[in-house]
Amino acid sequence: MEAVIKAFLTGYPGKTSKKDSKEKPLATSKKDPEKTPLLPTRVNYILIIGVLVLCEVTGVRADVHLLEQPGNLWITWANRTGQTDFCLSTQSATSPFQTCLIGIPSPISEGDFKGYVSDNCTTLGTDRLVSSADFTGGPDNSTTLTYRKVSCLLLKLNVSMWDEPHELQLLGSQSLPNITNIAQISGITGGCVGFRPQGVPWYLGWSRQEATRFLLRHPSFSKSTEPFTVVTADRHNLFMGSEYCGAYGYRFWNMYNCSQVGRQYRCGNARSPRPGLPEIQCTRRGGKWVNQSQEINESEPFSFTVNCTASSLGNASGCCGKAGTILPGKWVDSTQGSFTKPKALPPAIFLICGDRAWQGIPSRPVGGPCYLGKLTMLAPKHTDILKVLVNSSRTGIRRKRSTSHLDDTCSDEVQLWGPTARIFASILAPGVARAQALREIERLACWSVKQANLTTSFLGDLLDDVTSIRHAVLQNRAAIDFLLLAHGHGCEDVAGMCCFNLSDHSESIQKKFQLMKEHVNKIGVDSDPIGSWLRGLFGGIGEWAVHLLKGLLLGLVVILLLVVCLPCLLQIVCGNIRKMINNSISYHTEYKKLQKACGQPESRIV
């Protein structure tokens, strides 16, 4: 122990023995500063004591070596995000978490947020899509868009995170759908929300740099000394407006309650009048203007007629129907108490903002637009496609015949006849030749099935070995690249680091392997031809119905046979009876003739 302390204090290790450990330290030369003992002086003692006191006052603990070390990086990331499919991007060596994922909107239910919110969202309010509530006797067109539920759930999040959620760079995200059918609105329509401090004149067209510059130049708007997290997309011009958040394709009629003040017009609760007629303000943006007290005749999304009247209208009032409006969203106040710390989202649910995503809500977010959704691969896996096909509609499925596979006990010894045997058998016994041919075909089918089963089993074992080796290579390569990046070595330091080509024919191999297995199953024995015919005739009927129809068909065949054969049987029986009677009568006549010829009386005949 003393040797270790000595090596630590002197700055260089050395071999020491028990005898050397008892001796005093060797005197070092002042000319060699590297071998000068690092023994603390009086000034160093004062500095060490001051640092310890400062750490005790500020609450900084010195036992950081007792913190639990993190486990596997990718397993930790998958457990925290609920996402198991991801890939590393080698386009930038300094961004190892840049993924090959895209964001997709997903229906949000309160059951998914159980345990993550403090209360339920019971009263969400409604949105009107056809006309505002100012009209007297207007059409009832109220609905609840998704942004109300999203904003309510975000404000009620109560599970805080220790650190800020990791930002994921996405390839992009899917836009929200437009409303093309007012009777069928999906559960993801209108789910965009934005974040801003209360009262800040925010604009969705701002980039990340513009938003950051505004917050730095106007600190009074933020009303907080803590920094904000800008969640606007990097390529914000691709993820904004109706192209990203969706739009309402029909006209929305709104009441313009305007009064003329000199040569200007004041509309609604405007602070100051503006120049220009309200009609021009409406038609300049593609709207349709109707003066007050006139009728509005609309045919889409459904036909309705309503008067452009309301209470307490000004002398320049009217109705404006604008088309192609962006679906309404909501600005969430990012200075509220629920956003002062990063909040956790349920697994597999992400805050998606264009080409950026978080598995949680960063502290004091600003910007947008964003929605809650999930992540998926740009090119889905073969298993994902199979799941979609299985869960899709099952209409138009062809019914297979009730053939049974050849078992392992079938005979695979194929013994073909020679030319001489075939010629004599075909001339002398054609039936025997046909029976022999059918038997050999059956044995040949059995041999083919067994050979194909052995081949597929062999290829399956090889495929498992190749897959395990591939996984091991990819894991080792990811670990090596990440360790090099963690130590500051990029693509320019290590040759071939960012160019790692590993051929992937697993999908093609899996398809061919599956085709081989399906091809083997095509050889079978039709054990129930009548049942197969009935299933093909009547479609998807159950087995009990097949057995019932087979019984009825058998009874019908028996009845038909009786109807056809019974007259013949009756005719044969009647003929035999008639023949017996005729024979009996003929015998009796001959007997009488013989009796008269012999002159014997009839009474003496016994």
Curated annotation (Swiss-Prot):
Stretches the record annotates as Immunosuppression: 474-490
GO biological process: entry receptor-mediated virion attachment to host cell; fusion of virus membrane with host plasma membrane; symbiont entry into host cell
Region feature (Fusion peptide): 418-438
Site (Cleavage): R401, S402
Ranges facing Cytoplasmic side: 574-606
Keywords: Cleavage on pair of basic residues, Coiled coil, Disulfide bond, Fusion of virus membrane with host cell membrane, Fusion of virus membrane with host membrane, Glycoprotein, Host cell membrane, Host membrane, Host-virus interaction, Lipoprotein, Membrane, Palmitate, Signal, Transmembrane, Transmembrane helix, Viral attachment to host cell, Viral attachment to host entry receptor, Viral envelope protein, Viral penetration into host cytoplasm, Virion, Virus entry into host cell
Ranges in a coiled coil: 435-485, 503-533
Disulfide bonding pattern of the chain: C87-C499, C121-C152, C192-C245, C258-C267, C353-C370, C410-C446, C491-C498
Lipid moiety-binding residues (S-palmitoyl cysteine): C565, C568
Signal peptide: 1-62
Listed GO CC annotations: host cell plasma membrane; membrane; viral envelope; virion membrane
Extracellular face residues: 63-552
Region feature (Binding to host receptor): 185-226, 261-288
Gene3D superfamilies: 1.10.287.210
Domain of life: Viruses
One Pfam family per UniProt: TLV_coat
Family: Belongs to the Alpharetroviruses envelope glycoprotein family.
Name under which the protein is recorded: Envelope glycoprotein gp95
Lineage of the organism: Viruses, Riboviria, Pararnavirae, Artverviricota, Revtraviricetes
